[in-house]
Amino acid sequence: MTTKKEINSGSQRLSLKQLKAWEALEYGMYIHFGMSTFDGDELSKGDKPSSLYRPNKLDVYQWVSVARDAGMKYAVLTAKHVAGHCLWPSQHTDYHVGTSGNTTNVVEAFINACHKRGVLPGLYYCSWDNHHRFGSDSPTFTRWESAFTTSAYRDFQTAQVEELLTQFGPLVEMWIDIPTLLGHAGRRQQYDQIAGIQPDALIMMNNGFGDGTKLMLDATWPTDLMSIERWLPSSAKGYNPWHQLSHSGALERADASQLTYVPDSPGAFYIPGEVCDPIGYEWFWQPDDKLRSDAELLGMRLIARERKTNFLLDVPPDRSGRIPKETVGALMRLRKSLERFDR
């Protein structure tokens, strides 16, 4: 039975005050940039040489300045995506910017720019890695239901995430993509590692596609946040952050295999929602991708706000390493449209 105390404060790791402070950020920039920008494949096979990555006008400061000027309060950068190429010089692989056509430590530059511009930084790390497989089988090479990671890969991920958490300062959010590949124990280990090193960071285990009405426990738990990817919150009810998870032991330590999900029930865990969607139709920059219309972008922004979720809008830099001027223009028009709407 859900107690009054649970309903008021929740059984989640972070306090309601911390979670509501994150909700108050409301609007952020998602930045997909890396090897996929250069090989043109969002789900890159990880077989391209590091030298293919070579932005010739890289301007990380521009990215964060655009985010601030667009009214965004936080930003999340893809430190490592499916290609496995890292935007920092990791000590655990040679497949990173340090061996590429532009050796800038992008993660470091991004964090520094965020501090200078008053934007809170977050980082993204993908558990689907086609370059560093260590015997794992990713969805690129097998069916989704057969994909898995080995303990050797999970040790590699743990070591890299430790670098990200200890070398660059505090993060507002740590975004783990495709966490289903880690398995129940692997997700718990990953969650505990992040919470142990940066206890104030909110941890996102990507819940994938859906309107936020159901937390995919077998693929996502444990998590502090609910991702609503390429979707919008339920039109009938908006997003309900209270998720009832039933377990006979300590809820905050429960594994997904020990939990049952009770939909549409207020109670145990307060899990804020975050809509994430691109400003165009692709996560990474593509030469033929089109920006969404001004009206569609305003609608997405307003719906996310009215249905009480944060909005993480993906704004991918191009191969030069800058956000294109057309994209910047769309963001500034969106801010002005929102300001007019709020008068």
Where are these regions (language model features)?
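Mature catalytic domains of secreted/periplasmic carbohydrate-active enzymes
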Residues: M1-R343
